[in-house]
Amino acid sequence: MERIGLIKPEYVWITTGTGRWTNRKSAEALAKRDAGINTSKLIEVLGLENNPVTVIGKDEFIERSSNSKHAYMYGNISYVQLGEAMNGEISVINTDDWSGVTYSTYSGDKKEVPYSEKNLILEYETFNKKLAPKPVTKTVRMARNDPYNEYCLVVAAMIIGEPV
């Protein structure tokens, strides 16, 4: 997957997905399809500027990005090991003067308050010096107990914006 460093987002759609198949490549393709991100060439983004954005849904993202041959993705694609339970979370806060997106993937028990929410609230309150609004969060969990199939988990913020 191609990569870029930083992007100034204009529109953000957060999504998650899982896939299971007999090989990694197909499991990943199914996880991307489940997340709705299988229609474009993905370009991985390593960071986002914290400018205000518009949070949108899948249909609006597809409509707004229909003229582009690629899509910017900020997130993670992970493979679940045999005997492991993996959790994925992605959160977004958007206000008139600041926005932020964080994600996390981890194995083990699911947390009552997602890591991505905690980290995003801390980032918001540190930067803005006021209480954070409640983040919008999507979570996903997948446990692998089948040695004959590969399991893949996707957490992603799909971005329409300009590289910096």
Locate the predicted segments by residue.
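Helix-coil modules at protein/domain termini and other flexible surface or pore-lining loops
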Residues: 1-164
